[in-house]
Amino acid sequence: MKLADAIATAPRRTLKGTYWHQGPTRHPVTSCADPARGPGRYHRTGEPGVWYASNKEQGAWAELFRHFVDDGVDPFEVRRRVGRVAVTLQVLDLTDERTRSHLGVDETDLLSDDYTTTQAIAAARDANFDAVLAPAAALPGCQTLAVFVHALPNIEPERSEVRQPPPRLANLLPLIRPHEHMPDSVRRLLATLTRAGAEAIRRRRR
């Protein structure tokens, strides 16, 4: 069975709950580029937009840490808009092993830096799913919610603020999954931030 056909016949889950998102300070918490300006895990460049969130606040920040550290930037110096939202969505639940089996994919496919499989799973948009729920690539134990732009009206912002990452999140750095081809310079930056710890970040901000 082709992946698109498997998605069309996959079970649907009604997802209700609260999720966390962080993004640029200049945009509302529930906005995304549409069409997408660049590729992402569950979208290709030029496709309808996808908005990403995490089931935990630290999961949302972990995505920032993963990408900014890769660029050689200290993520604790970056200001972002972070917020909590309430969702009611029909999702393709890839955290469920039976659903993954139905699609013929495994967790390794979902976490890989090769987005070929996950971008193909975005066919769920054309099968009238609102979103994809999947294991998070950045922080083990968290879940990523990838919401297709047509379903953004089903997301209710509860609160948001512009801030730097809390210093306590320095404890997350050793837990974040690195990209598969992380340069040595990035590994050194990550090690420096980890050694500095939360208290050093607090002192730096005083």
UniProtKB/Swiss-Prot annotation:
Keywords, in A-Z order: NAD, Nucleotidyltransferase, Toxin-antitoxin system, Transferase
Quaternary structure note: Forms a heterotetramer with cognate antitoxin Rv3188.
Known EC number: 2.4.2.-
Function: Probable toxic component of a type II toxin-antitoxin (TA) system. Degrades NAD(+) by phosphorolysis. Neutralized by its cognate antitoxin Rv3188.
Family, per entry: Belongs to the MbcT/ParT/Res family.
Name this polypeptide is given: Probable NAD(+) phosphorylase Rv3189
InterPro entries on file: RES_dom
Any one Gene Ontology molecular-function term assigned to this protein's record: nucleotidyltransferase activity
Pfam families reported for this sequence: RES
Organism: Mycobacterium tuberculosis (strain ATCC 25618 / H37Rv)
Catalyzed reaction equations: phosphate + NAD(+) = ADP-alpha-D-ribose 1''-phosphate + nicotinamide + H(+)
